[in-house]
Amino acid sequence: MTPRFPSLRRGLLAPAIGVLLVTAYACASGRHDDRAAAGRNDPTSSAPYQAEVEEGLGAAVAILIDTSGSMSQNAPGDQRSKYVVAQEAVEAMLDATDAFVTRRPDFPIKIGLYSFSSSVHTLRPIQPYDRDAIRSALAKLPRPGGGTGIGDALREARPDLYRAGVFRKYLLVVTDGENTHGSEPEAVAREIWGKSEGAVQVYFVAFDTSPEKFAFLKDVGGDVIGAGTGGELRTALDGIYTGKILAEAVDAGEREPAKK
C-alpha cells in the first residue's frame, strides 16, 4: 500500500498556514495601534486624544507649579519667596477639596501634582484625592532654579488626565512669568483644546506677572486670573478651583457625555 504522506502533509499544512495568517494579522494590527497611539501623541498629528481606560463620573486635576529661578524672589509685600507662598496657597486648596468630597462622596476627585522649570517633575501622578499624600508631594517641591517651561509642563501632564478614568479633565497652572524654555504654551494649549475636543480645560494663575501674557486661554475654553500678592493668589486659586473646576465638573458630571 502506498503511504499517504502527501495527504498528511496537507492536513498539517492548513492549520499552520492559518496560524501564520492570524499571527501576521495580529502583528499588523499591533503596528496599526502603535501608529495610531503615536499619532495621538504627536504634536503635528490631528488625531484626537483617546482615553486609555474606561471613563466615568468624576474630575481629574493636574496642578502645575512654577519652580523656575524667579520663584525664589520675595512675593510682593511679603518676606517669603513666591515659591513658598505658592506652595502654601496650593495646600490651602485641600480644605476646599475636603469639604467637597464630604459633600459629594459619590463624585470622585483625582489630583496630580507637577513642578516645572527647565524640566518637568511628576511629584504625584493623578490619583484619587488623598490629603496626606498631596501634602507629602508638596513638601518635595524642588527648590527654584532654571527657566520656565510652561508648554512642556502642559504637554507632560496631559496624558495622565487620559489615564484617570473620569470625564472631566483640568490643567491648573501657577506661574510668575512667561515661557523661556521649550514649547510655547499657546501652541500647546491650542493643541490640547483641539485634540481633546474641548474635554481638557486649562486654567492659569499669573502670580506677580501680567495675565495678558496668557490671554489666548480664553480662545481655547480656559481662563487666566492675575494675582499680585500671596492673599490674591489664594483668592485666585479658590476662585478657579472651587468656583470653576469643581462647580463645572459636577454640573457636567450630572450628564454623562454622549457616546461617539
Task: Indicate where each model-derived feature is located.
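Bacterial N-terminal signal peptides that target proteins for export
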Residues: T2-A16
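C-terminal "exit" segments of structured domains
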Residues: G226-K260
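Von Willebrand factor
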Residues: E54-R124, A153-L154, Y170-V174, T209
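Short beta-strand-loop
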Residues: N74, F100-K140, I150, D160-A164, ...
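VWA/integrin I-like adhesion module and closely mimicked acidic/polar interface patches used
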Residues: L141-G147, G151, G177-G239
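Acidic, polar low-complexity linker/tail segments
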Residues: C27-P76, P128, R155, E254-R255
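Second-shell loop/turn segments in exported
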Residues: Q50-A51, M71-V84, V120-P125, L138-G147, ...
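Bacterial N-terminal signal peptides
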Residues: A14-A24
